[in-house]
Swiss-Prot record:
Family: Belongs to the Lgt family.
Protein name: Phosphatidylglycerol--prolipoprotein diacylglyceryl transferase
Gene transcribed to yield this protein: lgt
Main EC class the enzyme belongs to: transferase
PANTHER family named in the record: PHOSPHATIDYLGLYCEROL--PROLIPOPROTEIN DIACYLGLYCERYL TRANSFERASE (PTHR30589:SF0), PROLIPOPROTEIN DIACYLGLYCERYL TRANSFERASE (PTHR30589)
């Protein structure tokens, strides 16, 4: 006989104010945005980290966070529709807009973030790679909170585990089998571990090389996601794909190549040259991070 950990049943509503109900996943988004904004402001205040003035002002950062947030939400929903449940949404197109029912994709959200960063930088004449560094430096905060919300909601649980595994647990909607708490594995790898590695890199001067933090985030996230997928139950509407691979694995594999390519570019360009910061510099090329 093995003693399994009892999954703590949580109320899906985190905060209830009369007719307004805030669910855990929404709270994770709000918390991720606020904590990410605070961390980004702290990074921008230190000229030592950048080797000179930061690439964006505090005032511009507020607008930047808004653009990135919109990109993540639109991209995350679009990615889920296209990658994970296209047949369903073709039959029920109106439900595409019902995001409060759940259904977001990291890979779609990341692509939406990339588009938002590029558009914002082109509009304001700011360096794309350096602002990509800012966005991805804070990314693990939101990833950690999002995975914790997945655990609280008893969703995206893991594959069946050996009953002798001390932390195996039975999820309310996961059947009678003990399972890996894969949400906590991913929260640790994609959140805590990734944040720690990037923070140590930043402390060692990574922000002085535009794109180095961005490329490292992409590469390390993809590796962490693929590792986590070995313990995570595939989405029921998709199941296992070619050779036992999951959709998460297939979407993450190209990210490793892209991330390594960005790291090579960042390293070959060398440290950024100190520049005088301005509120708006439309005549500056967004393709250069060292001008």
């Amino acid at each position: 006989m093995f003693l399994l950990i009892t999954y703590p049943v949580f109320d899906p509503v985190a905060i209830s104010l009369g007719p307004i109900a805030i669910r855990w996943y929404a709270l994770a988004y709000i918390g991720g945005i606020m904590l990410g904004w605070l961390y980004a402001r702290a990074l921008l205040k230190s000229e030592k980290l950048w080797g000179g003035p930061a690439p964006i002002s505090g005032l511009q950062l507020d607008d930047f966070i808004l653009w990135v947030t919109i990109g993540i939400i639109l991209g995350g929903r679009t990615g889920y529709v296209l990658f994970y449940n296209l047949d369903f949404f073709i039959r029920h197109p109106a439900e595409i807009f019902e995001i409060w029912k759940g259904g977001m994709s990291f890979h779609g959200g990341f692509m939406g973030c990339v588009v938002a960063v590029i558009l914002f930088c082109r509009k304001h004449g700011l360096p794309i790679l350096s602002l990509g560094d800012v966005a991805t430096a804070v990314g693990p905060i939101g990833l950690f909170l999002g995975r914790i919300a997945n655990f609280i909601n008893s969703e995206l649980w893991g594959r069946p585990a050996d009953p002798s595994l001390p932390w195996a647990m039975v999820f309310p909607n996961g059947g009678p089998l003990p399972r890996h708490p894969s949400q906590l594995y991913e929260a640790t790898l994609e959140g805590l571990v990734l944040f720690t590695i990037l923070a140590l890199m930043i402390r060692a001067g990574a922000l002085k090389r535009p794109g180095l933090v961005l490329g490292s985030f992409i590469t390390l996230y993809a590796m962490a996601r693929i590792a986590g997928e070995f313990f995570r139950e595939p989405d029921p509407q998709l199941g296992f794909l070619w050779g036992g691979l999951t959709m998460g694995m297939l979407l993450s594999a190209p990210m490793i190549i892209a991330g390594l390519a960005i790291i090579c570019v960042a390293w070959s360009r060398g440290p950024r040259a100190p520049v005088a910061q301005t509120i708006s510099t439309p005549d500056v090329s967004t393709k250069a991070d060292r001008d």
